[in-house]
């Protein structure tokens, strides 16, 4: 089934020069990048995006990090795009759960700065795309 999913290349991925390689991996997987924007997220967008974590102790650090520098927000489309992107991204914790060969397994060392984000379900994708790309 053709799906759309939100992807974020977080500030650490942008700052460390991984954007080109990440986009190449998306394309090699057969997914299509249909929207892409380099921006520095404002706090309101970040807080809305991460609202499920608002009562957790790391919420403030998460918002501070995602708004600290430019990131790339994008919409990826393709067959089973959500699962395909999550497979490319690797496990959330880059050392304990991300396999070498995945984006996080290759480029990240901490769970707090783990290079990329991807929606985890069709419902999350719809909600997150509306937050980051309200006119799409």
From Swiss-Prot:
One GO BP: GTP biosynthetic process
Chain positions recorded as ATP binding sites: 10, 58, 86, 92, 104, 114
SMART domains linked to this entry: NDK
Active-site residues annotated for this sequence: 117 (pros-phosphohistidine intermediate)
Subcellular compartments: Cytoplasm
EC annotation from Swiss-Prot or TrEMBL: 2.7.4.6
Keyword ATP-binding: yes
Cellular component terms (Gene Ontology): cytoplasm
Molecular-function GO terms, alphabetical: ATP binding; metal ion binding; nucleoside diphosphate kinase activity
UniProt enzyme class: transferase
Catalyzed reactions: a 2'-deoxyribonucleoside 5'-diphosphate + ATP = a 2'-deoxyribonucleoside 5'-triphosphate + ADP; a ribonucleoside 5'-diphosphate + ATP = a ribonucleoside 5'-triphosphate + ADP
PANTHER family cross-referenced by the UniProt entry: NUCLEOSIDE DIPHOSPHATE KINASE
Subunit composition and interactions: Homotetramer.
Family stated for the protein in its record: Belongs to the NDK family.
Name of the protein: Nucleoside diphosphate kinase
Organism for this UniProt entry: Corynebacterium urealyticum (strain ATCC 43042 / DSM 7109)
């Amino acid at each position: 089934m053709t799906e759309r999913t939100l992807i974020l290349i977080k500030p650490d991925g942008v700052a460390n020069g991984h954007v080109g390689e990440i986009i190449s991996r998306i394309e090699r997987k057969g997914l299509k990048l249909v929207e892409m924007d380099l921006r520095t997220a404002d706090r309101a967008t970040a807080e809305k995006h991460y609202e499920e974590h608002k009562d957790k102790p790391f919420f403030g650090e998460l918002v501070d990090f995602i708004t600290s520098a430019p990131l790339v927000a994008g919409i990826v489309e393709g067959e089973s795009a959500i699962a395909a992107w999550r497979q490319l991204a690797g496990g959330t914790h880059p050392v304990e759960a991300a396999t070498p060969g995945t984006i996080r397994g290759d480029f990240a060392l901490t769970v707090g700065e783990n290079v990329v984000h991807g929606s985890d379900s069709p419902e999350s994708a719809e909600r997150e795309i509306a937050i980051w790309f309200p006119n799409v």
